[in-house]
């Protein structure tokens, strides 16, 4: 029997606002536990939340980036549950009136493009963080009240590969808006998955299993692939799939049962009494839309049509906003687009992967990369010398000064090079005869002798011109 797979994804994205969604506490990653909290975050009786307008603005921008319909009228709801990292015993979220709905993202897998629908997007607050030891459990409420958007896909994803492509496209578009860092390693992007399979041709969805807080795209793919095969084995053996929540074990590459679910959770949602409904005008939506930065697709089109890059180059450069912004700044500073792109995609990416750092964490600047590229373009340094200059600009050195200080500037003055050419020719009469007899290798040998005398600093183009002129005059 052949099966078809259906995958749904819920993605929580932490917004990069200065303060929390309902309190004035700052939003900072990595601070001391409970340093960024106040009585609203602690859930003290009698305190009232105040909605951060910037969160609504960012939510609208995210909705626009995902081609979604923006709600003109919305309210907030209480989701009731108790857990130590949720001192209010409820979460303020959106149940009935999400801020955006019916969006889509285009993905490409194995050369085929496909639109994945987005059912809805909610604004909500994050919970705190529990840490457990053998003796104690600790609660850190720094994260409590951090603004989130929850993006729920439609059941359009048909494979683990499509799931990862969707997540990559989603992260990319959100990142380019600037409203979130979407860094999974810092928890600013978290992924919950559900998966089911059914016989091909069947209209009835199979029973789904859930997996929560998978912390990398690679593990999302592996977890879904394992579950897909597990479902198939169970059904082919005549068994049935239970409605379960499972977790992915990174060590074994398998999923492990956490709990079974007899029905849907009852969170006893009801409208939040301490926050008024929110009305969003067409004028405000238009204003936010006018502030939207270029999306990856628009930048790719510009790079190909206006800057002469290949489709592949444009795709690589727009994988992250950080790399794309760096490229544009370097080109603005006078760097040749193709040469800048090559350095970013090869030398820079290799360095980042080797050091396991982000571009923003290095001392490399767009102006210094552009400066080095211009030195290559005008013949001040050779491509071979540029490798040494590149090491300098990685340490924050100005390329022109570094090249001069370390003796990496090419000899390009004909007045300096001609005597060297003459000396080499005087010492290699046989090579001159070989050249006259049509042996092209003689030119290469003479070039090598000149480069040897100048310790590799002679400009090959200038040397070639002088050498050929001198040989023809013999």
Curated annotation (Swiss-Prot):
State its Enzyme Commission number(s). 6.3.5.-
Check the record and name the InterPro entries matching this protein. Asn/Gln-tRNA_amidoTrfase_suB/E, Asn/Gln-tRNA_Trfase_suB/E_cat, Asn/Gln_amidotransferase, Asn/Gln_tRNA_amidoTrase-B-like, GatB, GatB_C_1, GatB_Yqey_C_2, Gln-tRNA_amidoTrfase_suB_CS
Q: Which Pfam families match?
A: GatB_N, GatB_Yqey
Quote the catalytic activity from the record. Answer: L-glutamyl-tRNA(Gln) + L-glutamine + ATP + H2O = L-glutaminyl-tRNA(Gln) + L-glutamate + ADP + phosphate + H(+); L-aspartyl-tRNA(Asn) + L-glutamine + ATP + H2O = L-asparaginyl-tRNA(Asn) + L-glutamate + ADP + phosphate + 2 H(+)
Please give a single GO biological process term from the UniProt record.
Answer: glutaminyl-tRNAGln biosynthesis via transamidation
List UniProt keywords, sorted A-Z.
Answer: ATP-binding, Ligase, Nucleotide-binding, Protein biosynthesis
Keyword Ligase among record annotations: yes
- Molecular function per GO: asparaginyl-tRNA synthase (glutamine-hydrolyzing) activity; ATP binding; glutaminyl-tRNA synthase (glutamine-hydrolyzing) activity
Q: Which family does it belong to?
A: Belongs to the GatB/GatE family. GatB subfamily.
- Oligomeric state and partners? Heterotrimer of A, B and C subunits.
What is this protein identified as?
Answer: Aspartyl/glutamyl-tRNA(Asn/Gln) amidotransferase subunit B
Species of provenance: Limosilactobacillus reuteri (strain DSM 20016)
